[in-house]
Each structure stands twice: as C-alpha cells, then as structure tokens.
C-alpha cells in the first residue's frame, strides 16, 4: 500500500468550510526517557456540515486528537483553531467559555444528573451559563430525537438508548458549531447504538450540524462521511463514503503492514461521571466544558 501525501491524508479544505483545524499538532506526555508522543505533527481540517469518524487502535492518538481539537487538553506544539478562533493561546477561563458556547460533547458515559428530568438535563449547560435556549430549535431537536414523551422522566426511568438520546439532545441544544462524540455507543446494545448513530447522521443531514466521532467500531464509522485513520500519533489514511466492510478491511491491512502499531497504552484521559466534564491528563489543566466562570 502506498503512503498518501500529508495533504491528501488531511484533505485541507477552504477556510470558509472549516469547523476546526490543526497544523503541526503535537502532544507529548512525560519527559526524558519516559516521554510518550501521543500526536506527531498532525495537520487536519474538519469540514463544516459533515460527519467525520476518527479510528485507530488503542494508543493511536484518536482520543488525544479529539481532546486537543476541543480545547480539553493543551498541546505541546502546533496550532489549533475552532472556526477562525485560534484556541492554543487561550487562557483556561476563555477555553471554558468557548467550549460551553460553541462545542457540544457526547461521551461513552451518559453523564446525566439523576435528580433532573430529561428536559432539565438537556438544557443544563445553558442553564449553568445563564443562557436561554432558542425555543424553536430546542423543540426541533427534541422531536428529531424522539424524546417528546420522555421529557419528564428521570435517567433511572429511561433505557440506555434513551439516556444517550438525551445526551445527544444536550449536545445539540445550544446549536454548537461542532459536536465531539467519544465512543458514544460504547455502553449501548447494538439496537440502541444504531439508533444513536442514526440520530447523529440526521443531525448532520437535517440540522446542518458538524460531528466528529472517535470510535473503534467499523459499523459505527460507516455512518460517517469520512473516516480518518490514526496510527502512532499520525493520520495514516482516510476513506470517503465508508462501509463497515471497507473500514474493517483497511484496518486489517494496517495491522498486517504494521502501519498502525498498538504498542502504547490507551490515550491518557477518560470521561468523568460528572455531566459534561473531562478528567485532564497528568500535568494538564482541568477541563470542564460546563463550568461557569
């Protein structure tokens, strides 16, 4: 398999159509002999109004890439932009506001507050920020996700799939510029997982949203417009209009050629049990998308 050029791999887009981008993005953990290079000079554009999946084995850098693009983690070198805003030079308070106002998050854990009903969980980030939701948009999101008859239910009264639908509605409710989803179907059975993936697809097609999803599942990646394959902290390939079979075959080819090594442990940093929060990697600043400053 030939190695595509860096420009081909990242499909650098026109600025007006870019939701997020990175140039020379490098992230290292530790120092000296214990240094782990999680991302190695990555150049990538995330096209606006598209569904992008990021795939790779454990330790390939996929979650670290999402964290850096979302401002949940600092970078060791390089630059990151959300739209026209360079976020690599922002202070933590500015990053917190940017995440709260312009980014939606979905994690493997649903992160719903058990004492709030579905509607209250959906509007929680805006309530914390002291903002009123766009009523027409909120009602459209609720209907699109089929939650109209579940709005007064608390999380314990909802199935796993319904809880993740609430989490999806929460991510969409503020009409963000970009939604980051980290293994959003990881805690769901296959039927519920397909429902959530269908809703993310519909958010792009019907609501003109932009979604970036980290996944290890070829079936999940097949719902996207574009798959970026990471290996050893680099983007090693890409696939337009993916199918589950084609993605699985591509991953097998990487494994056989050693193009996607999995020697490193999983990327540092996992989602917390608090709504919309993220545990920062060692020596990284705290990252809470919902914190009010």
List each language-model region with its residue ranges.
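Intrinsically disordered, low-complexity terminal tails and inter-domain linkers enriched
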Residues: 4-17, 259-292
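Polar/charged alpha-helical tracts
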Residues: 7-10, 14, 67, 134, ...
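ABC family nucleotide-binding domain
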Residues: 17-226, 230
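Conserved beta-strand-loop-alpha-helix hinge in the C-terminal portion
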Residues: 234-258
């Amino acid at each position: 398999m030939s190695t595509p050029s860096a420009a081909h791999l990242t499909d650098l887009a026109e600025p007006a159509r870019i939701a997020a981008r990175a140039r020379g993005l490098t992230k290292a953990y530790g120092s000296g002999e214990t240094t782990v290079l999680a991302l190695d000079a990555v150049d990538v554009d995330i096209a606006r109004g598209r569904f992008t999946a990021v795939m790779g084995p454990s330790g390939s850098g996929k979650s670290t890439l999402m964290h850096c693009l979302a401002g949940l983690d600092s970078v060791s070198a390089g630059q990151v932009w959300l739209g026209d805003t360079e976020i690599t030079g922002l202070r933590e308070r500015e990053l917190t506001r940017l995440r709260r106002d312009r980014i939606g998050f979905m994690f493997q854990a649903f992160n719903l507050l058990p004492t709030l009903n579905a509607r209250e969980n959906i509007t929680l980030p805006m309530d914390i920020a002291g903002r009123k939701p766009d009523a027409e948009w909120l009602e459209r999101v609720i209907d699109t996700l089929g939650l109209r008859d579940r709005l007064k239910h608390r999380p314990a009264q909802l199935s796993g799939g319904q809880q993740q639908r609430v989490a999806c509605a929460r991510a969409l409710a503020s009409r963000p510029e970009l939604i980051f989803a980290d293994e959003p179907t990881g805690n769901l059975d296959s039927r519920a997982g397909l429902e959530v993936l269908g809703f993310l697809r519909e958010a792009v097609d019907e609501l003109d949203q932009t979604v970036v999803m980290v996944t290890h599942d070829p079936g999940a990646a097949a719902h996207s417009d574009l798959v970026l394959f990471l290996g050893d902290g680099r983007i090693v390939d890409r696939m337009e209009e993916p199918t589950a079979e084609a993605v699985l075959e591509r991953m097998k080819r990487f494994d056989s050629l050693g193009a996607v090594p999995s020697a490193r442990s999983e990327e540092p940093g996992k989602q917390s049990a608090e709504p919309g929060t993220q545990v920062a990697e060692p020596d990284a600043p705290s990252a809470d998308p919902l914190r009010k400053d």
